[in-house]
Amino acid sequence: ASDVYKRQKKYRTRFLISSGNKLFTLAVSDVAYFYSENKLTFVVTKNNREYVLDFALDKLCEQLNPDVFFRTNRQTLVSVDAIQRIEPYFLGKAVVHVLPPFKDKIIVSKDKIAAFKVWLNY
């Protein structure tokens, strides 16, 4: 049984956040989504707090449980718990509405929409 345990991937459970002159931990379970803008990565919590993270979205994808987080596009990585609804968009794409609301449209590309629907229905 210990061999099986060792082979199971361990996913990140928290982040150390620097805010002003304070440090605190943020549980991954409190995260609604991550987004990238101007070469910075931001984390938005379920209670609508926003912090800068020192991780690229690609790195986060490797460290977070793929059953919980989905890379919707180059700019966003969303938690299944934050998704409020999905609407069809042009050319086979979809728009994802999250809580707390994101300032832009979160668009899932035509290439990812099938995988996204499978992921949501898991």
Language-model segments: residues:
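Basic, polyanion-interacting recognition surfaces, primarily
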Residues: 2, 6-122
